[in-house]
């Protein structure tokens, strides 16, 4: 099956959380495009809506929202995601991925679109060890 590293950012607090998605949680991303929302319950966050904002594959090739394909393409670019020109007017052919999430992606970037009942900090709080029983 496919595994993704999901970087989930919470705009309310400004914090980002790393999630390892596998199985059904990762399957909910397959076929979605950058900008679409998924249900947070797939990752264990009840009541949350998560918006996909970007992704990259194992080589670090970024996904570009304007490229509506599922594979990789070498595109002539003048700026934006995947290319930062060194001088004004510079254009260069760069390798980018399409906006559709496939099994080839490794990392998916997302933000919280709708908050649930619990905060993300509560989901990611470290479990407190139980106090030893008093004798």
From Swiss-Prot:
Coiled coil: none annotated. It comes from the Archaea. SMART domains: Ribosomal_S6e (SM01405). NCBIfam families: PRK04290.1-3. One of its GO terms (biological process) is translation. This is Small ribosomal subunit protein eS6. InterPro entries: Ribosomal_eS6, Ribosomal_eS6_arc. GO terms for molecular function: structural constituent of ribosome.
